[in-house]
Structure formats: structure tokens, C-alpha cells
Amino acid sequence: MKVSYKSNADKVSADFKRAAEKALTTSALLVEGDAKLRAPVDTGNLRSSLNHKVETDRATIGTNVEYAPFVEFSTSRTPAQPFLEPALRENKGKIQKIFAEHIRNATK
């Protein structure tokens, strides 16, 4: 009796990688959008500068506005007005669901 075996490990690995990248992108957009809603508005520059970047295994949400850290964390004269950290913290459950859904769909 002859038994043959064909591995699909490469396909499964590629499917999981694509699912993770899609989940990262979806999650980054979620947090970025929430941070934009939370960002204090004076000129609107801070809010409009928020963006995201997705790499293979991480997503970065941030801004290039020089004064953003002072808004998020405070100065000696100005109280903190956090917008990034709360956006991430408040969406952790949704992010977990996004990843679970994308991974589950990759296994179908």
C-alpha cells in the first residue's frame, strides 16, 4: 500500500500572514479614526496630521506635529489632553475581535 502526502503548510502560512496584515490595517484605521475624534481642535492641524503605517508585524498610529506629545502628556502649564492612548485602550476589545475574525476567515 502506497500513501502519499501533500503539504499545504506554505499556503496556510501565506493565508495567515495576509489575514494578520488585513487585521492590522483594519485595527490601525479604527484607532486612527478614534484618535481623530478625540484630538483637541484649535487649528485642526493635529487632527488632520494623524495617520497610520502598517508593516509586516506591526501598525503605527501617530503624527508628525511637533507639539503632539505636549498635548497627549501635558506641560508644566497645560494639562494633558490624551487622544492616542485612550483611542487604543478603548478599542482593545474590538481589535481582538478583528484579529479573531480575520484569522477565523483564513482557516475556512
Language model regions located:
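Short, Lys/Arg-rich flexible segments
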Residues: 1-108
